[in-house]
Amino acid sequence: FNNAYLASENDMLKEALDFSVQTGFIQDFSIVAKVILDQKSPFLKSLLINKGTKNDIEKGMTVFSKDYLVGTVIETNYLTSRVLLLTDLNSKLPIVIEGTDVNAILEGTGNKLNLKLSYLPENYKIEANKIIFTSGKDGFLTPGIAVAKSYLNDKQKIFIKLLSDPDQALIVNVTNGQINK
């Protein structure tokens, strides 16, 4: 049993180390960390990771699980850091919608299956199956990082769902948000 767990964790770590190569992130600014506490609350969503200022983690750095953005470092200590997830009510991310020049803000709702788009142009209706990317207008993240997708539910209503599942994050990559193009 213990060997199977270690083998599984080893595979996750290898995948995390390949992250910078797969996504184009600069290796010097990609730090692998383990999630040590998942703050469960209906609306407040955060993770505690096992890397801090000792490992050059800084407030404002971006956090990825697998290949997808899950949040931002909001607090650092010597050995740990707190990550605000995109699903948190306090999370607001400037985005652009695939195939358009429409900018908006992706807001957390506490529900990973239905985030909110704010500040859309008047009378704009988002279509289903559109990828939502970072716009870069926050000055931290490079534009073009895929974050979420629009879906049509059973009631023919559009909802926004993250491409990642922050609740499943065990190993994460912490970066400065810049892509090596």
Where are these regions (language model features)?
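A secondary-structure micro-motif
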Residues: 4-5, 12, 16-181
